[in-house]
């Protein structure tokens, strides 16, 4: 029964995703999630993250990592597996799956890419392509201690509930900036990861309007 219900949800999500990674159009004037006082003055850095829908006996969940406290940037924060798109990566999906293997030993053969969410531009000048995939693991995920402190999953049902989200306010450059925040099992997901999770929530619950997602 859980498998049938899970398949229905997966089909629904898949129908709302882009079939190909969204191309960046510099002329479109895309704004970042927050605007720094000093614009970077260089093209944004392509990056990709994996939003992994993990199939378990009890239902679907989404995979997150707790970054190592030893990392120079975003240490100790909650994140999706992912990172910069390397020149050797064929596309965003290739980059996201490579990073997932390097970070948590997620086997590429156990992942089926459903599609892509619209680009997410960060105030730190990263242009992120969220890659959505169904994962059916045959072994536990193993954190790479050089990058990841721990790995955990949050039930999809919980993340599809609007009441699971609140807003979090921080200051950058003397200006207040708000992000989404998710609390679960004593852990707090905020910033880019929470914003992307909320976008995924909104995308999954939006009315059916066509074969693939539009906007973000």
Label each residue range with its predicted role.
Residues 143-185:
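NUDIX/MutT-family hydrolases
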Residues 1-79, 84-138, 172-216:
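N-terminal leader/linker segments that precede catalytic domains of diphosphate-processing enzymes
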